[in-house]
């Protein structure tokens, strides 16, 4: 039998090893052996909750174990106050979405807001259009994007455009999305691939990542319910969003292609009514996905 002193030393050593091992093997939620992230949450996923209780919903995001977020507004809070709330919950805002007309009429104002929020990226997720998106609207948008990119770059922020499906209207030998890509300066304009809004208009995310290597710096990981109608409207019932791994997306191939193409940031965006229930399972799926 060991002496009390030796037993205490043995227990202390074992505890130290356990603590060291725990620290050395700790990982970020939502990442695993294959998928390394970094993964965050687009806060629009919880827009209904934020509209009722901003501090409480921010605490819920923290409770998911998430460390990074993408913004879609500040829910009537000044940027500095919203930033303080993020920081009090150990959350870091990487990127944010702003209205197209803000970029068109006063990109400097967007730059100042993004700077106040500590963002690395500021982007746009919808180009206003009437009826089917057309060439004139695509060219005009590209001009706005280049100008916004130049202004944001002066503040150390990168502009991005988030795909939304309607821009894949046929054009020449390709699509209007190809035209926007061709008309935007890679030094000033990056892209955020929303997987749902690539598959919805019957496009292939893997082929698009291969075609536009290094252009997509951000990605929305979003799954689609089996049987969801597909078209070029850029619109779909929000409840066609489902927990990652339960829909139609071929995640191993998509995530492998994203890594190879240089995607730097990934965000779960789930617009469904049950998003808060989906998010833990989606994070778990990313931890276990193999590619």
Task: Specify the residue positions occupied by each region the protein language model found.
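C-terminal motif of bacterial Sec signal peptides marking the signal peptidase cleavage site
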Residues: 19-22
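Bacterial N-terminal signal peptides that target proteins for export
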Residues: 1-11
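Aromatic-rich peripheral "rim/lid" segments of glycoside hydrolase catalytic domains that contact
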Residues: 257, 272-291
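Hydrophobic faces of well-ordered beta-strands that scaffold small-molecule active sites
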Residues: 37-42, 69-71, 93-98, 122-124, ...
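Active-site beta-loop-alpha junctions enriched in small/polar residues
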Residues: 44-46, 72-74, 98-101, 127-129, ...
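N-terminal pre-domain/capping segments
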Residues: 2, 24-121, 214, 284, ...
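Active-site acidic/histidine proton-transfer and metal-coordination neighborhood
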Residues: 68, 75, 100-191, 276
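Acidic/histidine-rich catalytic cores of soluble enzymes
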Residues: 154-248
């Amino acid at each position: 039998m060991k002496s009390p002193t030796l037993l205490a030393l043995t227990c202390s050593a074992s505890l130290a090893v356990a603590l060291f091992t725990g620290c050395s093997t700790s990982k970020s939620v939502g990442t695993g052996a294959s998928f390394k992230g970094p993964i965050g949450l687009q806060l629009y996923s919880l827009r209904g909750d934020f509209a009722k209780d901003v501090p409480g919903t921010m605490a819920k995001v923290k409770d998911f174990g998430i460390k990074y977020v993408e913004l879609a507004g500040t829910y009537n809070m000044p940027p500095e106050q919203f930033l303080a709330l993020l920081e009090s919950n150990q959350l870091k805002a990487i990127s944010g979405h702003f209205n197209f007309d803000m970029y068109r009429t006063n990109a400097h104002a967007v730059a100042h807001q993004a700077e106040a929020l500590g963002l690395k990226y500021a982007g746009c997720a919808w180009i206003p259009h009437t009826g089917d998106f057309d060439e004139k609207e695509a060219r005009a948008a590209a001009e706005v994007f280049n100008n916004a990119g130049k202004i944001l770059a002066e503040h150390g922020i990168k502009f991005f455009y988030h795909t939304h499906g309607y821009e894949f209207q046929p054009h020449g030998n390709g699509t209007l999305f190809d035209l926007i890509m061709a008309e935007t300066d890679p030094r000033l304009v990056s892209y955020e691939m929303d997987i749902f809004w690539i598959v919805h208009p019957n496009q292939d995310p893997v082929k698009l990542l291969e075609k536009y290597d290094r252009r997509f710096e951000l990605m929305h990981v979003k799954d689609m319910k089996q049987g969801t109608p597909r078209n070029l409207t850029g619109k779909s019932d929000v409840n066609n969003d489902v927990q990652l791994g339960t829909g139609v997306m071929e995640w191993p191939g998509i995530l492998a292609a994203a890594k190879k193409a240089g995607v730097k940031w990934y965000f779960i965006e789930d617009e469904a009514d049950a998003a808060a229930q989906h998010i833990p399972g989606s994070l778990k799926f990313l931890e276990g996905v193999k590619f």
